[in-house]
Structures are given as C-alpha cells and as structure tokens.
Regions:
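Membrane-interface junctions of multi-pass transporters
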Residues: 26-30, 44-90, 204-217, 222-302
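Short helical (or helix-break) motifs at transmembrane helix termini and adjacent helical loops
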Residues: 99-105, 124-150, 156-165, 311-318, ...
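The feature identifies polytopic integral membrane transport proteins across all domains of life
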Residues: 53, 57, 84-95, 112-125, ...
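Structural signature of hydrophobic alpha-helical transmembrane segments
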Residues: 2-15, 36, 55-72, 115-130, ...
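C-terminal ends of transmembrane helices
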Residues: 17-30, 71-85, 131-144, 194-207, ...
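Structural signal for the N-terminal portions of transmembrane helices
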Residues: 9-14, 60-66, 90-91, 152-155, ...
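Hydrophobic alpha-helical transmembrane segments in multi-pass integral membrane proteins
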Residues: 50, 102-108, 159-173, 225-238, ...
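Entry/N-cap segments of selected transmembrane alpha helices
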Residues: 8-22, 79-111, 116, 175-191, ...
C-alpha cells in the first residue's frame, strides 16, 4: 500500500506558494526566477536541510508528473516552423561542437582519475535545460523575440539530442533493442499525432467553445495525452522526459500553428501552478549536501560549473557572431549553459550503473543547480543592459 506523508506533501505545496509570492513581491530587477526559489526551498525543507519534509513514493509520483509536464512545455513551445533554417542549423552545429568538447574534456579528466566515465560525464555537460528556461523566458518576454527564436533552436537540439543519447546508449547496454523500442514508441506517437491533427482541424470551433465550459475538454484530453505518453515511455523503459517532450510536439502539430491563448493559459495554470513546482522542490529535497562535504567534492562542483560554460557557452559565442550582437551572444552562451533535469537523469543512471562516484554526481548536480541559480540572472542582466544602451 502506498504510504502518503501528508505533512511533507503540504510543505511542498506550501513551498511552491511561498516561491511564487516571493517573486511577485520583490522588485522585478532583483527577483530571481521562481524555479530557483523552488530548488532552494526544497533544499531547506528536505532531509539534507532542516528535515522538515521527507521524500516518499507519493511525492516522487507527482515529481515525475511535473517533469513530464516540464518537457511537455519544452516540446510545445518549440514551433519547428519558427526555428527551421538558421536557428535549428546553428543549434545542431553548436551541440555537436559541445559533444566533441565535452567528450574531449571528459577523456582528459578520466585519464587523470578525476572521473570514471567520460561518456556519462560528457553527456551530462552537453545539455541545455530549455524546459527549465521556458518559464523564465515567458516571464521576461523573450519567447517571441528574434533572440528567443535562436535560443529555442539551440535549446531544442541541446535538450532533444541528449534525450536520444540517454534513451539509446546510456539507459541500458542494448542500444539496438532500445532503438527498436524507440521506433515502436515513435510509431505510436506519429499515429496519435495524425489522428489528433485530423480531429482538431475538424472540430476546432467546438474545442474552442469548451475552453470556457466546465467540462474543459481540450485541457482534459491534453492531460491524458501527456500522462499517457509519459506512462508509455516509462513502461517501455524509455526516459519519461521523451514522453512529455513528444506530447508537446504532438499538441503543437495538432494545432497547426493556431495560437489559442485561453488554452495556453489553462495548461500553464495546470503545469506551472501545481505539477512543475513539485519537480523542482523535490529535486532540491533530494540534493545530497553531505556528498559535498569534502574539499574534493566542492572542487568538482566549481570545476563542472565552469565547464558547463565552456562546453555549451563557447560554441554559442563562436557560431552566432554573424547573426546576434555581442551582448545577445553572451546572453545566449549563459542560457545555453543552464542545465538541470537531464544532468539529474544522466547522473542517476551513471551511479546505478557503477560508472560514476556519488561525489562526482553531487558535483554535477550541484553545478547544474548553481547554473540554474546564476546563469539566467547573468543572461537577463546582459539583455537588459543591451536594451538600456540601445535606448540611451
């Protein structure tokens, strides 16, 4: 029987509310991204903080649903008609450069005995948390800008590429079997997408009418799609991130470029209002502060924090020099180097496979959390400074 710790559950919900209230009352220039506060509050209330709340299977269940919703919005916000051409082409080149740099640096660290596996460590460093960045970009109004288009292109490849790496090569030792399972999953997803596109295109006026009704047909069907594909991915032993991401892409394809603001706002309320904060707070609660107790572990955290910027930021500075001005390129570098969900997923797999020490995993996850705390702040400051200079 599933044990439910109601007090811990309430504290997680309370922490989500406190984070939102704090961001709302602080002046905009100093207000941190809400996901940052959610991570910090998770650390504070968790077993490695003040032990006010404990982790259990019930909270883990909601955290996984939140992770699925987070990647749903990543897939939904990435309009491939918008990013095709230069944005996705440059994003692909940048990620391939990042993989090369990450594996090269990982190989050196493995030879020096600092890490065990350059593949797992390198793969973790070559990610971009576009799902984490989307709420930040929404709040700052960057989603619809030219800069936002290039960032979405870089982030889409920086998120989806590592998901495929995790699915095919890192989660098991049988890439051929995983490829067959992935093809099966994609076939199901494509079938759902084609059916959805036909139904939505034919019944769009009726669907729009139900958005203001109590039955909330569109929202309910979308939630079924998200959790259904997340559950299917988990059942097939694929990463649940893939299920959420594909669900978002299917929804975007079904709408065929239609922007339905009421639908967007209702899904945003469901996702960012409840499920997604669970993932960030639960991630904070699971962060092992004790594993960073040694000087060596802290040195790894600082090293990985800097390497994230080298691996993901340096290609952005190099490749976008003809399409973005210097302040925006610098901001893009910091945004691209922001990492978290996939770092958590990859380090978990690596530790379970015996390919990574817990101190290395803690250093990577700690650096990823620190990147989420710091890099968006720096990027936002660079963009605001460029905007002020342009209007001076």
């Amino acid at each position: 029987m599933l044990r439910v710790d109601t007090s811990s559950f309430f504290l997680i919900v309370l922490s989500a509310a406190v984070a939102a209230i704090t961001v709302a009352v602080l002046p905009k220039r100093i207000a941190p991204p809400v996901v940052v506060l959610e991570l910090l509050l998770g650390i504070v209330i968790g077993p490695h903080g003040f032990s006010l709340a404990s982790t259990d299977e019930f909270s883990l269940f909601f955290s996984n649903l939140g992770l699925g919703m987070l990647f749903y919005f990543a897939g939904y916000e990435i309009n491939f008609d918008r990013i095709r051409g230069a944005p996705v082409r440059l994003g692909g080149r940048g990620w391939l450069m990042s993989i090369g740099i990450a594996y090269g640096l990982g190989g050196v660290l493995a030879l020096l005995g600092v890490i065990d596996s350059f593949v797992y460590t390198g793969s973790a460093m070559a990610t971009t948390a576009i799902g984490t960045l989307i709420p930040i970009l929404r709040d700052t109004g960057e989603m619809k800008t030219r800069f936002g288009t290039y960032l979405l292109g870089a982030g889409a490849v920086g998120e989806f590429g590592p998901i495929l790496l995790v699915t095919l090569f890192l989660s098991t030792g049988h890439p051929l079997r995983e490829a067959v399972i992935l093809v099966f999953f994609v076939a199901i997803a494509v079938t759902i997408a084609l059916l959805s596109m036909g139904v939505v295109w034919r019944e769009l006026p009726m669907i729009e009418r139900t958005l203001e009704a109590s039955d909330q047909l569109a929202v309910r069907v979308t939630v079924v799609l998200i959790f259904g594909l997340v559950g299917l991915a988990g059942h097939l032993h694929l990463d649940i991130l893939l299920g959420g991401f594909v669900a978002g892409m299917i929804t975007r394809a079904a709408l065929r470029g239609q922007e339905i603001s009421v639908f967007d706002s209702k899904l945003t309320a469901v996702g960012f209002g409840f499920f997604i904060p669970f993932f960030f707070i639960y991630s904070g609660m699971n962060f092992d502060l004790e594993a960073l107790g040694s000087a060596g572990a802290m040195a790894k955290l600082a090293m990985f924090f800097g390497l994230f910027l080298v691996v993901r930021g340096a290609p952005a500075l190099l490749l976008y020099r003809h399409v973005l001005p210097s302040p925006q390129r610098a901001a893009l570098a910091f945004y691209c180097a922001t990492e978290l969900p996939l770092v958590v997923a990859i380090t978990t797999l690596a530790v379970e496979a015996g390919q990574m020490k817990t101190s290395t995993a803690a250093g990577l996850v700690g650096a990823a959390m620190l990147s989420t705390l710091v890099f968006p702040f720096v990027a936002r400051g660079l963009l605001e400074g460029a905007g002020d200079a342009a209007h001076a």
